[in-house]
Amino acid sequence: AMKPVLKMLTWVSLSSFSSVFIYKIDTLFINNYFGLYYTGVLGSISEFGAYCISLTGVIGLLFRPLMLIAYSEKRHEDLVKITINGAYIVGIISSLLCGIVMGASASILHVWLNDEISHYSVWMMIKMLIIPITTYGSTVGIVNNLWNHVKSFSIWSLVIAAVYVGISLILLELGMGMIGFLVIGAIAAILQGAILPIMIYKEAYPQSVGTVYIQMIKCTSFFILVFVVTLWVDSVMEASNLFMLMIELVIS
């Protein structure tokens, strides 16, 4: 009786490992190809991103009990509605949070760390870019766990992680810069954390997958809007201390 449970836990653990691996492995590569200083800079930025992931992840978990109840009672139409609406709400909230952080990244790094680190704000933007999209995807992915479609997700996650490592190593050896490396990592994270869960979700509810993609596009559009507005506010105010930064974030 325990064997199916252990198999599922194994696949879930592998998928979680792949997610963390893609988000964190860049530190190892950067230390080897760019040096310890840049590793420390990116480590600080990634840590800030981890806080945002934790916050938005908690919001997504709030919908899990409702989805579980609907699935256990075989109310599949309700499950689809809860999934789509829940993912949209989570996507909008995380888009608002991450859009503001991205737009004000230069000021945040200046106040949080120092002016020298603030010059690497583009790195923070790339790191924050993936969070709203993957948070949306992970909420949709709860359905895959309910349907026990974790094996295919885990296998494809490992494939994406392996391809990401292979491409990164080749391009780094050819002299690829830091921003290019981070962009490749962001693409891998979005493929693994958003596109893949939705593709597997299609196996359970193919009739609603179009709506899932449309809602994701809406969240992404809102994310871009918040980012652009905050970036403009940041360019006007240029917060130099915590008080001014808080005012800037509130205005944004």
Role assignments for model-derived ranges:
Residues A1-Y23, L66, Y71-K81, K202-I217, ...:
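Interhelical loop/hinge segments that connect adjacent transmembrane helices in multipass membrane
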Residues A1, K151, L158-A194, K202, ...:
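Membrane-interface helix-loop junctions in multi-pass transport and translocation proteins
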Residues M128-I160:
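Membrane-interface junctions at transmembrane-helix termini in multi-pass inner-membrane proteins
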Residues L6, G43, R75-A104, S121-M124, ...:
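Interfacial transmembrane-helix starts/ends
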Residues L96-N114, L169-E173, W232-V236:
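Short membrane-interface helical motifs at transmembrane helix boundaries
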